[in-house]
Design a protein with these regions (language model features):
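A short amphipathic alpha-helical interaction element
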Residues: 214-233
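Low-complexity, Gly/Ser/Thr/Pro-rich intrinsically disordered linker/tail segments
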Residues: 172-203
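N-terminal capping segments
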Residues: 1-90, 143-145, 156-158, 188, ...
């Protein structure tokens, strides 16, 4: 685990990112964005019901504190669109920015319900909550909402405007299903339910020095080491 937690797109790295987002605000329609006045104005035009005048002061406080916002499914999409949360946490409370690429890492722009349907269409395992596997990084959902299971009976979720990104006890919420996310690498985790097949998950990219290489290891870091050794002659 200590090795995988440093590798973007593994379930351990994804969970660590979600936990570091605790305390950040919920902005409807946002996908891990820096809180700015320009963003607030744009979202207010898109979703006026969620950006009424009674909420403006809170939104502007988030902006002043240079926070990072998302909605429930936006937390999941944003992790992928920012290349595994690259630069996101470091930007909180500072003037730093980070890059986000729409649809990156094979993560489509889906709603909370749409993401569940998409995962099932990709052959991901899923089931009702009475079959919840002890696999951190899987999604939890009920109609119109999604969160991330972090293990030990707890989840991280962008719960809503009045809550922001919070850690909640799974048993205290009304989750109906769990499901495997097709763009997260769950390693050797065993799933049952649904298609119960391992989807075509993008391979985790390792950079040289982030893991111990062994005979049979594959990846970009192996190629980098081979090239380095060739240069040495």
């Amino acid at each position: 685990m200590s090795e995988r937690i440093n590798i973007p797109f593994t379930n351990e790295h994804f969970v660590a990112f979600c936990e570091k987002m605790l305390g950040q605000p919920y902005w409807y329609g946002s996908v891990v964005y820096k809180c700015t006045e320009n963003l607030r104005a744009r979202k207010a035009k898109q979703y006026p019901a969620h950006y009424g005048s009674s909420r403006t002061a809170r939104y502007r406080d988030d902006i002043a504190k240079k926070k990072v916002c998302a909605d429930c499914v936006g937390l999941i999409k944003g992790y992928n669109w920012t290349n595994g949360g690259q630069g996101v946490i470091e930007s909180i409370g500072t003037d730093r920015t980070f890059s986000s690429k729409y649809g990156a890492h094979g993560c489509p722009d889906k709603s909370a319900n749409g993401m569940f349907s998409y995962a099932k269409s990709k052959g991901c395992a899923w089931g009702t909550m009475d079959t919840l596997p002890e696999v951190p990084g899987i999604a939890l959902r009920f109609d119109g909402h999604v969160g991330v299971y972090i293990g030990g009976g707890y989840a991280v979720e962008e719960r809503g405007f009045n809550y922001g990104c919070v850690k909640t006890k799974v048993s205290s919420r009304k989750w109906t299903h769990w499901y495997q996310l097709p763009f997260v690498d769950y390693g050797n985790a065993v799933f049952t339910g649904g298609g119960a097949t391992k989807p075509d998950t993008p391979a985790s990219e390792y950079t040289l020095g982030t893991r111990t290489l062994k005979k049979g290891s594959k990846g970009a870091d192996v190629k980098a080491l081979q090239e380095f050794l060739l240069q040495l002659g």
